[in-house]
């Protein structure tokens, strides 16, 4: 199975401009993401998908590969779709979408989503990762997306609110979403052509579009958390984690 991992990266983040190039222990964040991903088994190729020449130069500077995408891409999925069209992938090729703000992603977590497609061929069109929340401060933080899934690990819903709500108890597991997706090239193209979903627009969560249009999302539960960098403070958290790794 041909497996291409793409790391979408844009320079103009509203909360943290230039985020992909923010230094973490002397290396740009995008390099940490790329190098972590390269440790995962089963990948055919890795590319950073960007529309910014500064990011392109940084990636090529450490020996990484880049595919330049249109600056008109309205979403991360549009950027991924643009990249796979340029790369000429086949319909049944597997695409891993690793968010470029996860410099501490564990390589085995990437392997988990790949193995879902290997073990359950044809049963679903999209897969992603979850992690049981340990830090209670994340429960009501809208930057940490929560998720619920059925007994077969198919996603039921994703929300910025705490889900599920325990009416009579606070002692129950809550899972958050980790920003890794896997899907076939054929599905990415079909997904990108779908109109914006109502729930997707409310929560500002692209994965809800798949659920709204009746597509299955298989969930793998990772044993490893992954810090998502949204603010400069998150950079310091990453450096603290790396100091003890």
From Swiss-Prot:
Could you tell me what reaction this enzyme catalyses? 8-amino-3,8-dideoxy-alpha-D-manno-octulosonate + CTP = CMP-8-amino-3,8-dideoxy-alpha-D-manno-oct-2-ulosonate + diphosphate
Q: Which family does it belong to?
A: Belongs to the KdsB family.
Q: Which UniProt keywords apply?
A: Cytoplasm, Lipopolysaccharide biosynthesis, Nucleotidyltransferase, Transferase
Top-level EC class as recorded in UniProt: transferase
Q: Subcellular location, in the record's words?
A: Cytoplasm
Q: What is its main location?
A: cytoplasm
What species does this protein belong to? Answer: Shewanella baltica (strain OS155 / ATCC BAA-1091)
GO terms, biological process: lipopolysaccharide biosynthetic process
Protein name per Swiss-Prot or TrEMBL = 8-amino-3,8-dideoxy-manno-octulosonate cytidylyltransferase
């Amino acid at each position: 199975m041909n497996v291409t991992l793409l790391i979408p990266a844009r320079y103009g983040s509203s909360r943290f401009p230039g985020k992909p190039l923010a230094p973490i222990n002397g290396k740009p964040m995008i390099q940490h993401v790329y190098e972590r991903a390269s440790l995962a088994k089963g990948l055919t190729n890795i590319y950073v998908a960007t529309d910014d020449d500064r990011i392109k130069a940084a990636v090529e500077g450490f020996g990484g590969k880049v595919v330049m995408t249109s600056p008109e891409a309205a979403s991360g999925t549009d950027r991924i779709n643009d990249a796979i069209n340029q790369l000429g992938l086949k319909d049944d090729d597997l695409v891993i979408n690793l968010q470029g703000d996860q410099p501490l992603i564990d390589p085995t977590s990437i392997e988990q989503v790949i193995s879902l497609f290997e073990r359950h061929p044809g049963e679903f069109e999209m897969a992603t990762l979850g992690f049981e929340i340990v830090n209670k401060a994340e429960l009501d933080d809208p930057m940490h997306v929560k998720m619920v899934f059925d007994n077969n690990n198919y996603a039921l819903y994703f929300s910025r609110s705490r889900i599920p709500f325990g009416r009579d108890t606070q002692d129950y597991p809550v899972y958050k979403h980790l920003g890794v997706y896997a899907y076939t090239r054929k599905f990415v193209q079909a997904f990108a052509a779908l109109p914006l979903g109502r729930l997707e627009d409310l929560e500002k969560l692209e994965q809800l579009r798949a659920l709204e249009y009746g597509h299955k999302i298989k969930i793998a539960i990772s044993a490893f958390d992954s810090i998502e960098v949204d603010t400069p403070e998150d950079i310091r958290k990453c450096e603290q984690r790396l100091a003890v790794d």
